[in-house]
Amino acid sequence: MQVLRVVLKECGLIKTRVGKLSLTAKGKQLLVDHNELMRTIILFLFRDYNTGWLDSYEDNEVGNLGRLYSLWLLHHYGADWRNTGFYADEYSKAFPMLNAVHGYEYRVFNRLFRFIGLCEINESDDFKGKNWGKEVRKTELLDLMFTFE
């Protein structure tokens, strides 16, 4: 809930007045235009949202830089369950100046893609064991929301 509050506030959709949250004029306007509401939130999440906001990893750029490349990777390779380390390796090839070992997998998949429904993470009882929580696959929503040429 805290992340949602931050996203809505940073998008200018809510404000705090006398300790209470309320909709801004922009927020009220977007309540009737769901497409524009979704566009506003998605643009914020992919351009401005700092996925390192609530963690202790030192490199702030990991997972934030090249976010659309990470989305393309999931789109391209995500039909089947894959270890998140695979995506971190591919990301490291594209951005060798970053230390993607720390934070990338958690920030990208847990803090962004799963947050907006673009991936599933294997946290069900069927996946208990060594790779529990470390394998992901894309959802149908990813292909419905984004196209790549």
Which residue ranges define each predicted feature?
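Short amphipathic alpha-helical interaction segments
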Residues: 1-10, 17, 98-117
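Short, mixed-charge, low-aromatic patches
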Residues: 2, 29, 65-70, 99
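Short N-terminal helix-initiation segments at or just after the protein's N-terminus
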Residues: 10-14, 57-60
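Helix-boundary capping/turn motifs
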Residues: 13-16, 85-86
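Accessory beta->alpha helical hairpin/"wing" motif in late/C-terminal subdomains of nucleic-acid enzymes
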Residues: 15-52, 120-149
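A near-ubiquitous, low-amplitude feature marking generic local secondary-structure context
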Residues: 24, 28, 53-57, 92, ...
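Leucine-rich, amphipathic alpha-helical/linker segments
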Residues: 34-88
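Extended alpha-helical scaffolds
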Residues: 72-111, 120, 125-130
